[in-house]
Amino acid sequence: MLREAAALGFTHAELSHGIRIVLLPGVIRAVEEGIIKISSTHNFCPLPTGITQAAPNLFEPSVPDRREHEQWLRHTKRSIDFAAQVHAKVLVLHLGSVNFFWFNPGRTLKTFVRRHPTVSVPDDKAYRAVLKKACEKLRKRMGPYWEQVKASLEEVRAYAAQRGVALGLENREKFEELPIDDDFPALLDSIAQPHTCGYWHDTGHADIKQSMGMLDHQLHLEKNAARLLGFHLHDVTPDGRDHQPVGSGHINFEMVSGFWRPHHLLTLELSPRVSRDDVIMSKQRIDALIGQRFGG
């Protein structure tokens, strides 16, 4: 896999949340032989023993259950250790979700859209009213989950700092997932020193949230620009499929590229079903934007 990425012209790769333990010897060998460098990894990497497919939300830092929290902490620390071992600069993290047991207001939004296929979402007045009420319910219920997220970060911030691994807190695409997008600046400002935490921006997730009326993609980047560590770059098609080739959807990557800085990590995060030619095309489009942004 890493050899194939190198053959396509990539000098760096992110190790995803789908790396099984049996793959580690080959990964480490590829790094030691200089075939490719690892820029970032994604929690949990490697996967917990016995898990054979991607499972970034297997254990959540928002869950107050002691046993699940201990598993999250154990495997996150192991992921930090592995990131340091392969000289990755950033470990990308999900921060969990709010559990609604019986009634998830996010489903209300989906139901409204399904029952009103001709309305213009997110601008429709009735939709905006449903969205406002749903967001109020999310805020009302999130308190203990949000406090648990902050406590969980407190348990790993110094551990990561000691190992020179930055923690990239990723924006998410589902209604109930944390953080609520407006809360990133306050969260990052509240973390005690020393810490390496920063904001990790996923273009597809932001676009999906924008289509729901929950954020403005450009304004969201402006608010978090000073805290950015890197980007997951992928497009979203008009029917809402993300992790698609750059240029195949409606994301304004020229706008996104305006927020890139030389120290940022840029990762193409494409679906495994994307063809080799589309991977190459996506790389070429990002390379062209890098050239426009930084010259050369």
Question: Whereabouts are the PLM-identified features?
Answer:
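N-terminal pre-domain/capping segments
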Residues: M1-I80, A84-A88, R107-A126, P144, ...
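Histidine-acidic metal/acid-base catalytic patches
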Residues: M1-A6, I21, G34, R78-L93, ...
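Acidic-residue sensor for enzyme active/binding pockets
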Residues: E14, E170, E269
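Short, basic/glycine-rich phosphate-binding loops at helix/coil junctions
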Residues: P56, R128-K132, H232-T237
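Residue-level "edge-of-site" marker
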Residues: G18, F44, G96, E173, ...
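Active-site acidic/histidine proton-transfer and metal-coordination neighborhood
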Residues: P61-G198
